[in-house]
Regions:
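C-terminal catalytic ATP-binding subdomain
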Residues: 1-26
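Active-site beta3 strand of CheY-like receiver
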Residues: 77-83
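Short hydrophobic/Thr-rich beta-strand motif most characteristic of the beta2 strand and flanking loop
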Residues: 58-65, 73
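Charged docking surfaces used in two-component/phosphorelay signaling
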Residues: 48-56, 124
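Receiver (REC) domain active-site loop signature in two-component systems and cognate sites
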Residues: 88
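C-terminal output helix
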Residues: 139-148
């Protein structure tokens, strides 16, 4: 009979194994694993928050600070869903959404508008340019993931 070794007395864990334990890879059963999500917002805080939440769920995250930067990245990265702030410099969220929805390649890509405003006019304007949903900032993890579940068939 082999003695049971107390893990505390065993050799130290391999550094690579420690890294994997600290940063687990999402399982294949994870509905968000490998999903490509784009977050367009001029607020570094919003971009980082969304990126952190989404990466923990297994998503691949692409970020942009405004619509101009986003358009090139959308063409290159082909995201599964796009979150876009309505108020940004150079090319705002409404204009960005309209350009995405008028493009034959990306018109079926879900676009979720992000705003600190919760007015009926802002929501209606988002719908007019083709957005699929409207989230008010600050959003919760559940709201962010719920939007993905609703619009992307995982």
């Amino acid at each position: 009979m082999q003695p049971i070794v107390d893990p505390a007395e065993s050799e130290e864990m391999d550094p690579q194994a420690e890294e994997v334990a600290d940063n687990p890879t999402p399982s294949r059963d994870d509905p968000f694993s490998g999903l490509k999500v784009m977050v367009i917002d001029d607020s570094k805080t919003i971009r980082r928050t969304a990126e952190t939440l989404l990466k923990k769920e297994g998503c691949e995250v692409v970020t942009a600070t405004d619509g101009f930067e986003a358009l090139a990245k959308i063409a290159d990265e082909k995201p599964d869903i796009i979150f876009v702030d309505i108020m940004m410099p150079r090319l705002d969220g409404y204009q960005t959404c309209a350009l995405i929805k008028n493009n034959q390649v990306f018109k079926r890509t879900p676009v979720v508008m992000l705003s600190s405003k919760d007015g009926l006019f802002d929501r209606a304007r988002g719908r007019i340019v083709g957005s699929d949903q409207y989230l008010t900032k600050p959003f919760t993890k559940d709201e962010l993931l719920g939007a993905i579940r609703e619009h992307v068939h995982t």
